[in-house]
């Protein structure tokens, strides 16, 4: 079983510095009081109230560029962390039966509540060595073919599919292209539109381009409050349009990457609330919110027959965009 990430917030982000200074001060006062056996409850209460107020104000209306930082926080719970917190009887399955086992995409069998399911998702690393092994959460073709093998298994045995999305994008190396990266993603899309079992997708961190969409064709798309989902990362968009990374903020605003924007556009069906400061501050609470939403939507989908679920999924995506000849 994979060790869960720490609930400690970790290094502060740019916009969190004032809050981190207050929280560090609180820790110092508590330590001093404990070591010297003195009562500092009044001072603590004042600073805690100030920190709580600052936290509310800070996270109430974050701009897209700051939400992007939260979504990329290395302390944020990963797919394997959520599987541990959400599921019982987890059995990981490996390999695509064609080339190899891609550690950037994990999946297997588990029990969610009373429901046996196939659950999968992108997996980033926790440190440099782990990130190299998992390719920073960017799957190769064999990762998507492993996902397809698991989804075919789920459809054959009438098991719901749960997909957790957290990737900067599919691996863009020459080796991946030589092994058919585009074909692997396209085939996943084709098959996911054909399945009759319920498919629930949730963006838990980054949702980057086709690398996210390759396991993102669901009857329901859920998204954490401080996650992002986009056709391209703001970094890459800035480089392509302006030839440098100085315009990330402008790109992030234009791309509509936040859960709030995507809910308004009809891409996301439900925004899952996060603990104040992000899911990494209280992974158990974040997982409880995710589990409640998944079970509620799953119960709704299980009341429908297979052809209805398939048609609903197709119509959901057909309604997302239209083109006009000019």
Curated annotation (Swiss-Prot):
Enzymatic reactions:
N(6)-carboxybiotinyl-L-lysyl-[protein] + acetyl-CoA = N(6)-biotinyl-L-lysyl-[protein] + malonyl-CoA
Q: Would the keyword Endoplasmic reticulum turn up in this protein's UniProt record?
A: no
Q: Which domain of life is it from?
A: Bacteria
Reply yes or no: does the keyword Manganese apply: no
InterPro entries the record matches? Acetyl_CoA_COase_a_su, ClpP/crotonase-like_dom_sf, COA_CT_C
**Compartments where found:** Cytoplasm
Domain CoA carboxyltransferase C-terminal, by residue range, is: 46-300
Per UniProt, the keywords (alphabetical) are:
ATP-binding, Cytoplasm, Fatty acid biosynthesis, Fatty acid metabolism, Lipid biosynthesis, Lipid metabolism, Nucleotide-binding, Transferase
Q: In which pathway does it act?
A: Lipid metabolism; malonyl-CoA biosynthesis; malonyl-CoA from acetyl-CoA: step 1/1
Give the GO molecular function terms: acetyl-CoA carboxylase activity; ATP binding; carboxyl- or carbamoyltransferase activity
Q: What does this protein do?
A: Component of the acetyl coenzyme A carboxylase (ACC) complex. First, biotin carboxylase catalyzes the carboxylation of biotin on its carrier protein (BCCP) and then the CO(2) group is transferred by the carboxyltransferase to acetyl-CoA to form malonyl-CoA.
Subunit arrangement? Answer: Acetyl-CoA carboxylase is a heterohexamer composed of biotin carboxyl carrier protein (AccB), biotin carboxylase (AccC) and two subunits each of ACCase subunit alpha (AccA) and ACCase subunit beta (AccD).
Per its record, how is this protein called by name? Acetyl-coenzyme A carboxylase carboxyl transferase subunit alpha
């Amino acid at each position: 079983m994979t060790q869960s990430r720490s609930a400690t917030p970790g290094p502060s982000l740019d916009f969190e510095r004032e809050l981190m200074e207050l929280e560090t001060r609180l820790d110092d006062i508590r330590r001093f009081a404990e070591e010297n056996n003195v009562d500092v409850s009044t001072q603590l209460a004042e600073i805690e109230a100030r920190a709580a107020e600052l936290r509310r104000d800070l996270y109430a209306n974050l701009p897209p560029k700051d939400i992007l930082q939260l979504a990329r926080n290395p302390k944020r719970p990963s797919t394997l962390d959520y599987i541990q917190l959400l599921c019982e009887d987890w059995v990981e399955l490996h390999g695509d039966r064609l080339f190899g086992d891609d550690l950037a995409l994990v999946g297997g069998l588990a029990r969610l509540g009373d429901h046996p399911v196939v659950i999968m998702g992108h997996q980033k690393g926790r440190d440099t060595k782990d990130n190299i092994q998992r390719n920073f959460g960017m799957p190769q073709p064999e990762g998507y073919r492993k996902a397809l093998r698991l989804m075919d298994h789920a459809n054959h045995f009438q098991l719901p599919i749960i997909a957790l999305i957290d990737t900067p994008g599919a691996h863009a190396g020459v080796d991946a292209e030589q092994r058919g990266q585009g074909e692997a993603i396209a085939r996943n899309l084709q098959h996911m539109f054909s399945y009759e079992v319920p498919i629930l997708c949730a963006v838990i961190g980054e949702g980057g381009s086709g690398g996210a969409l390759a396991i993102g064709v669901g009857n329901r798309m859920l998204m954490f409050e401080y996650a992002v989902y986009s056709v391209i990362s703001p970094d890459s968009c800035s480089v392509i349009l302006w030839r440098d990374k100085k315009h990330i903020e402008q790109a992030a605003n234009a791309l509509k990457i936040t859960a709030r924007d995507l809910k308004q556009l009809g891409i996301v069906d439900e925004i899952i609330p996060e603990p104040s400061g992000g899911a990494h501050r209280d992974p158990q609470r974040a997982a409880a919110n995710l589990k409640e939403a998944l079970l509620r939507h799953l119960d709704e989908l299980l009341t429908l027959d297979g052809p209805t679920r398939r048609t609903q999924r197709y119509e959901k995506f057909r309604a997302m965009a239209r083109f006009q000849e000019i």
